[in-house]
Amino acid sequence: MSDSSKAVHVIIAFLNIDSTDALKSYTTEKVSHCVKKFAHHDTEAHVVLKVEKTRQIAELSMHLSGHDFFVKEESEDLYASINMLTDSLTNQLRKHKEKVTSHH
């Protein structure tokens, strides 16, 4: 299995919200699955989960293949924000991969 040879280290910070094992596991699983499709070696992703009034915000920053990625999504549900974040990240990574491979 090629996925096991590359690790995605997801570092999660919680702001104005209690850290839960469920949120940690869900975020780590979603981000790792998304990034593993595009990473060629070990990668580190930084995620911030925070609450501002009624807004549930998920932010991600990472460096991959010589490019910095930043994604921020918000909704009224933190799990929905995480889902939107990984969808947006997948789109950014796919566009970057297409741009890089079209130059070769």
Q: For each predicted feature, which ranges?
A:
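N-terminal, polar/charged subdomain of small-to-medium soluble alpha/beta proteins
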Residues: M1-H104
